[in-house]
Amino acid sequence: MENIQKLIARYPLVEDLVALKETTWFNPGATSLAQGLPYVGLTEQDVNAAHDRLARFAPYLAKAFPQTAAAGGMIESDVVAIPAMQKRLEKEYGQTIDGEMLLKKDSHLAISGSIKARGGIYEVLTHAEKLALEAGLLTTDDDYSVLLSPEFKQFFSQYSIAVGSTGNLGLSIGIMSACIGFKVTVHMSADARAWKKAKLRSHGVTVVEYEDDYGVAVEQGRKAAQSDPNCFFIDDENSRTLFLGYAVAGQRLKAQFAQQGRVVDASHPLFVYLPCGVGGGPGGVAFGLKLAFGDNVHCFFAEPTHSPCMLLGVYTGLHDAISVQDIGIDNLTAADGLAVGRASGFVGRAMERLLDGLYTLDDQTMYDMLGWLAQEEGIRLEPSALAGMAGPQRICAAAAYQQRHGFSQTQLGNATHLVWATGGGMVPEDEMEQYLAKGR
């Protein structure tokens, strides 16, 4: 306890985190892209290479997953305006939201219905390509739909993949790995929803369940993989490959905005609100957004009050050396995808200069907004996916933050607020009804 008091003396905001208060922290260490980029350790070239790899796999994906065929084997989500929800939020919170609110529907991404379809699928494909190239079975000029042949399935069946997950990452990696022909084991934490485990098993995936939280599931997955030279462990806490799979979203969003005639520049700032668990998904997306929009995009991470691992790590500068459990927080939240007690040290250190801030919100707030969005826009998401929805009113209410960045009323009026909806497209009807019943 005395250690917590010492921490609070140095970092006063920790007191609010411990008290489970909804908290907003604006990052005093935020820099320009030019200053912050060298610390990421990855470059625009790396993201372009990921983009090219996904293009090579597009013919394969279009055939393996017919729901991606219309988009030519690209796994991408829509961006939609949510004016009725914007009005509802203004009414509920008594706070005007300047500019326009949009929703990025990663919740409805093909194959696995969450943001994890980006990173998870990309890393499985990267590994498959590497094995096939090394074995001389494939060249990068081939039509990758050959990977659907029995010979390739046979080849990949010698190898296995393991991952630890609270649910959505396991879903994307499990479904993709099984499709390619890998043997796959997903180590699921206690928070994982029963339907996600059942769906994985229906694809022939081995699911190992733990009574403990995310950190334990990842650790056990890592251990199990170490003893088998043919097993590849996808490390959600440290993977650069996952991170790059998410980062591709930046250029793609830029193209979507261009198609819609939406301007992002100094006088039309873009604010993006990303739900954060261990940090790989939002970190990778934020990195891609920064490369695409430079200093005109402002990224915020959103976490449950019971799992504020990234806010705690970045704010104190302790990163993965501290967990929410260390300050007496239980890491129990309805936002199962965000139930992580210790943030990725790689993501925290890579992105701490490129984030404008982080905030926390209560489970009940997520349930309330889940209900409002369903009522106002007819869009149904899982609780985690609503974490970003609280962002716009926090930013619009923050005069000191606006002054520090020199935002004028005109700029704020021209702003775009993009809420990144991370999952929910595959939630079973009965489960969704239970979520909706919890909103006020």
Curated annotation (Swiss-Prot):
Enzyme class: lyase
GO annotation, biological process: D-serine catabolic process; isoleucine biosynthetic process
Domain of life (superkingdom): Bacteria
GO molecular-function terms, A-Z: D-serine ammonia-lyase activity; hydro-lyase activity; pyridoxal phosphate binding
Pfam families in alphabetical order: PALP
Record-listed E.C. numbers: 4.3.1.18
Cofactor(s) recorded in Swiss-Prot or TrEMBL: pyridoxal 5'-phosphate
Reactions accelerated catalytically: D-serine = pyruvate + NH4(+)
Name this protein carries in UniProt: D-serine dehydratase
Biological source species: Salmonella paratyphi B (strain ATCC BAA-1250 / SPB7)
Lineage: Bacteria, Pseudomonadati, Pseudomonadota, Gammaproteobacteria, Enterobacterales
